[in-house]
Amino acid sequence: MKLVYAIVNSDDTYAVNKGLLKAGIRATKLSSTGGFFFVRKTTLLICCPDEQVDLVIEVCKKYSKKRKQFVPSSTIMEPDGAASYPVEVAIGGATIFVTDIERFEKV
């Protein structure tokens, strides 16, 4: 058994979760923040047999879209920086961790 942590942009959560459900895979959803801009994210916890890990990753890849977004440059400059013109940055996609499960009980 494996535990897959899939961290996705909150905008992609519904699509990823729906894709997992279509594949017969259930996930526990946790709200999280992170990244350089402290963007809202969702961490999906997915317990699955070893042979389903690749399927989980493929579903996450399919429904976690990378995209570009403009943010104020003051977000990435020093706090006292005078410039505030928009800067284009890449966001989205998924960060996935796969770990072994030593023991699993559903009580």
State what each model feature region is.
Residues 1-107:
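Positively charged, small/polar-rich N-terminal and surface patches that mediate targeting and assembly
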